[in-house]
């Protein structure tokens, strides 16, 4: 038997919202989805009139829906924002090269300027080459660190006031779980924040989709017929996040509200004053924000360039010993060559 739309618009329901369980027609779902994102933006004061905002664009469902909705809300509610697309090319054959074509389609569809930065031009490496050297066990560590800094570099280059990322409610709940399981209190403090950074030397990042369910983002993109890239990264199956995602899906089967429950729990967490907060400063090598000297990106890059790919994996003291050992070996070789040349 057909079900009427719960909003009493007179139309038949076309879907059931995963977040609320409401039976809605497509138009009422669009209106509710967009209104919730507008409420998130306005209640959290994410933007100010006249600001230039970079939308972190990957071509996937989240960034595509984010670009579409931000453009729509910017016009509907007169935010007064200048929107641009910022995309990072990690150099993953068969994945990123294809998804960038979707990003270019987004550029044309939404009439937004697009800037693409590659790992190759920023670091002299592609993820394909990195994985060839390190294998698949820690590749997501390299990619995540380089990608975060690449977005900062791109944002600085574009002169934007903030970066809008497509992190959704599922992503944030997964991150809370990951940080709890790893005992990472530093990241646990800030992983539910809708705005991060924004100090004197940093460009803030905002998450307009923080309370949007992944399933609803997919439904919105589907019913709106948005063009997006849906293939998973070829290196992602071994990522630690995948285990947190699987665990979250299992929890959701027995408690449908678990995603929002975890986010709200993360927001309410308090730490003792005795728990030390990592101090964020500026990397003395690259000049970008870091909680260590040198920053993680510079340490990982040094390891790759030295042929010590595991330099930035694990404890800092271990990395320092690896550098000292290699420097000692190089010094011994140079000394041996000098002695040889003397004869």
Swiss-Prot record:
<comment type="pathway">
    <text>tRNA modification; 5-methoxycarbonylmethyl-2-thiouridine-tRNA biosynthesis.</text>
</comment>
<comment type="function">
    <text>Plays a central role in 2-thiolation of mcm(5)S(2)U at tRNA wobble positions of tRNA(Lys), tRNA(Glu) and tRNA(Gln). Directly binds tRNAs and probably acts by catalyzing adenylation of tRNAs, an intermediate required for 2-thiolation. It is unclear whether it acts as a sulfurtransferase that transfers sulfur from thiocarboxylated URM1 onto the uridine of tRNAs at wobble position.</text>
</comment>
<dbReference type="Pfam" id="PF16503">
    <property type="entry name" value="zn-ribbon_14"/>
</dbReference>
<dbReference type="GO" id="GO:0000049">
    <property type="term" value="F:tRNA binding"/>
</dbReference>
<keyword id="KW-0694">RNA-binding</keyword>
<dbReference type="GO" id="GO:0002098">
    <property type="term" value="P:tRNA wobble uridine modification"/>
</dbReference>
<dbReference type="InterPro" id="IPR014729">
    <property type="entry name" value="Rossmann-like_a/b/a_fold"/>
</dbReference>
<dbReference type="GO" id="GO:0034227">
    <property type="term" value="P:tRNA thio-modification"/>
</dbReference>
<dbReference type="InterPro" id="IPR020554">
    <property type="entry name" value="UPF0021_CS"/>
</dbReference>
<dbReference type="Pfam" id="PF01171">
    <property type="entry name" value="ATP_bind_3"/>
</dbReference>
<comment type="similarity">
    <text>Belongs to the TtcA family. CTU1/NCS6/ATPBD3 subfamily.</text>
</comment>
<dbReference type="GO" id="GO:0032447">
    <property type="term" value="P:protein urmylation"/>
</dbReference>
<dbReference type="InterPro" id="IPR032442">
    <property type="entry name" value="CTU1_C"/>
</dbReference>
<dbReference type="InterPro" id="IPR011063">
    <property type="entry name" value="TilS/TtcA_N"/>
</dbReference>
<dbReference type="InterPro" id="IPR056369">
    <property type="entry name" value="CTU1-like_ATP-bd"/>
</dbReference>
<keyword id="KW-0819">tRNA processing</keyword>
<dbReference type="InterPro" id="IPR000541">
    <property type="entry name" value="Ncs6/Tuc1/Ctu1"/>
</dbReference>
<dbReference type="GO" id="GO:0002143">
    <property type="term" value="P:tRNA wobble position uridine thiolation"/>
</dbReference>
<keyword id="KW-0820">tRNA-binding</keyword>
<protein>
    <recommendedName>
        <fullName>Cytoplasmic tRNA 2-thiolation protein 1</fullName>
        <ecNumber>2.7.7.-</ecNumber>
    </recommendedName>
</protein>
<dbReference type="GO" id="GO:0005739">
    <property type="term" value="C:mitochondrion"/>
</dbReference>
<keyword id="KW-0808">Transferase</keyword>
<dbReference type="InterPro" id="IPR035107">
    <property type="entry name" value="tRNA_thiolation_TtcA_Ctu1"/>
</dbReference>
<keyword id="KW-0963">Cytoplasm</keyword>
<dbReference type="GO" id="GO:0002144">
    <property type="term" value="C:cytosolic tRNA wobble base thiouridylase complex"/>
</dbReference>
<dbReference type="GO" id="GO:0016779">
    <property type="term" value="F:nucleotidyltransferase activity"/>
</dbReference>
<dbReference type="GO" id="GO:0005829">
    <property type="term" value="C:cytosol"/>
</dbReference>
